Amino acid sequence: MGVRECPALLLLLSLLLPPLGLPALGAPPRLICDSRVLERYILEAREAENVTMGCAEGCSFGENVTVPDTKVNFYSWKRMEVEQQAVEVWQGLALLSEAILQGQALLANSSQPSETLRLHVDKAVSSLRSLTSLLRALGAQKEAISPPDAASAAPLRTFAVDTLCKLFRIYSNFLRGKLKLYTGEACRRGDR
């Protein structure tokens, strides 16, 4: 018995899945366009930043971790092609994911890592994976792979951090800045 033969079952599933927090069948893959979704990730990043602010012991990496520069020149950003914005966001997200994973490994190798720190780093790893999936559904990866003029694309600006606090500050700033600007514009365009 297929789905076409049982429309009542399909209707029942489409009514039950959303209240459970599961995507409904045929639901558009634009979850990131719901501002509450991105705000949840931003809130988690800020919580992690706040937890690590007062941390001295166990928060230093002992080596530098490369992160994307989160500064945004709004005039330049508005004039940038959406494909170039996607490249910056995608590269920044990849670099942040790498940095958080590196931080996770360094934390695991420390003598006595705090359970709270480990929890926030693990949450960040999970959140970055989810954000990557949400951006894929929005089409950011496709835009980032084929920018109109790849030769003229400026390299991603980066710098190094040596503490969890600085890493989480960059993570929070990236989500509130470039990622939020890009998703807002991509969702407004609505041609996905």
Curated annotation (Swiss-Prot):
UniProt keyword annotation of Secreted present: yes
Span of the signal peptide: 1-26
Keywords, ordered alphabetically: Disulfide bond, Erythrocyte maturation, Glycoprotein, Hormone, Secreted, Signal
GO CC terms in record: extracellular space
Source taxon at top rank: Eukaryota
MF-aspect GO terms: cytokine activity; erythropoietin receptor binding; hormone activity; protein kinase activator activity
Segments traversing the membrane: none
Glycosylation sites: 50, 64, 109
Compartments, record wording: Secreted
GO biological process, one term: positive regulation of cell population proliferation
One protein family per Pfam: EPO_TPO
Family annotation (InterPro entries): 4_helix_cytokine-like_core, EPO/TPO_CS, EPO_TPO, Erythroptn
Residue pairs linked by disulfide bridges in the UniProt entry: 33-187, 55-59
Glycoprotein listed as a keyword: yes
Family: Belongs to the EPO/TPO family.
Function (record text): Hormone involved in the regulation of erythrocyte proliferation and differentiation and the maintenance of a physiological level of circulating erythrocyte mass. Binds to EPOR leading to EPOR dimerization and JAK2 activation thereby activating specific downstream effectors, including STAT1 and STAT3.
The name this protein goes by in its record: Erythropoietin
Species: Equus caballus
Taxonomic placement: Eukaryota, Metazoa, Chordata, Craniata, Vertebrata
Gene name, Swiss-Prot/TrEMBL: EPO
